[in-house]
Design a protein with these regions (language model features):
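Peri-catalytic and regulatory segments of divalent metal-dependent proteins
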Residues: 18-106, 151, 155-158, 172-176, ...
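Surface-exposed, interaction-prone regions with an acidic/low-complexity signature
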Residues: 115-118, 125, 191-232
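Long, well-structured alpha-helical subdomains associated
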Residues: 138, 159-215
Length: 232
């Protein structure tokens, strides 16, 4: 009986850890990530593209939208991994990395426009549609978004190793050579080492917090029991 239970447990564990990443998985992960940060859930768009990628777009209406390619879903193997990618992208938004691109693109539009009237200026600015898929972040910004992403993963009750494992998929498939979106930079040894270090630290911190909560709960239970006994 014990052997049967062990087999069932292993099956359940592996089936949840390694599952197909489909649209429903992506939407659920995005909802959990944004909820953990009290961030308004942005529209999610799925793109049929041979390039595994994820990025944020900035529309004429001033709103962000998130884009994930079907190829990305194919190479990832768990909800933890897609959650890591989405947490990384949210990091770029929350840390203000897109603001610089928006400002520089506005300046380029104004400088390059034939401004004969004030209306031309308004039109030049109004017609800007930033395809932030083409954004090129610095290594410092990528590291900041990575560190942010790992923290949010734990906060949303995902594995701290989700983003690290996602980057490993890119590395194993020789991806990350296109200068845009999530795969802006190859999964270098330094970047993977930093992600592993962040994941370990967050896992340990999360473990300490849980132990602290458990100890506090035990103390509360003992105090409650003492109060009951004192009442007799």
């Amino acid at each position: 009986m014990k052997k049967i239970f062990t087999v069932i447990f292993i099956f359940i564990f592996t089936s949840t850890a390694f599952c197909e990443v489909n649209k429903k998985t992506v939407l659920r992960a995005w909802k959990n990530i944004t909820r953990a940060e009290n961030f308004s859930e942005l529209p999610m768009n799925f793109e049929s593209d041979d390039e595994p990628n994820a990025w944020v777009a900035y529309g004429d209406d001033g709103d962000y939208s998130v884009h994930v390619t079907t190829s990305l879903m194919k190479i990832l193997e768990s909800e933890n991994e897609i959650a890591g990618v989405l947490a990384h992208e949210l990091g770029h938004i929350q840390l203000g990395h897109y603001n610089n691109f928006a400002l520089s693109d506005t300046v380029r539009a104004i400088m390059g426009a034939n401004l004969e009237r004030a209306d031309d200026l308004a039109q030049a600015v109004g017609n800007i549609n930033l395809e932030l898929k083409e954004s090129k972040f610095s290594r410092e910004q990528e590291t900041e978004a990575d560190n942010y992403g790992v923290k949010v993963l734990v906060k949303a009750n995902y594995s701290a190793w989700g983003l690290y494992n996602a980057m490993k998929r890119f590395d194993e498939n020789d991806l990350g050579t296109e200068a845009n979106g999530f795969n802006s930079h190859p999964a270098s040894k330094e970047r993977l080492a930093n992600l592993a270090n962040q994941a370990r630290n967050q896992s340990q911190e999360n473990h300490r917090e849980k132990n602290k909560d458990n100890n506090n709960n035990k103390k509360d239970n003992i105090d409650s029991l003492a109060d009951i006994l004192m009442g007799y």
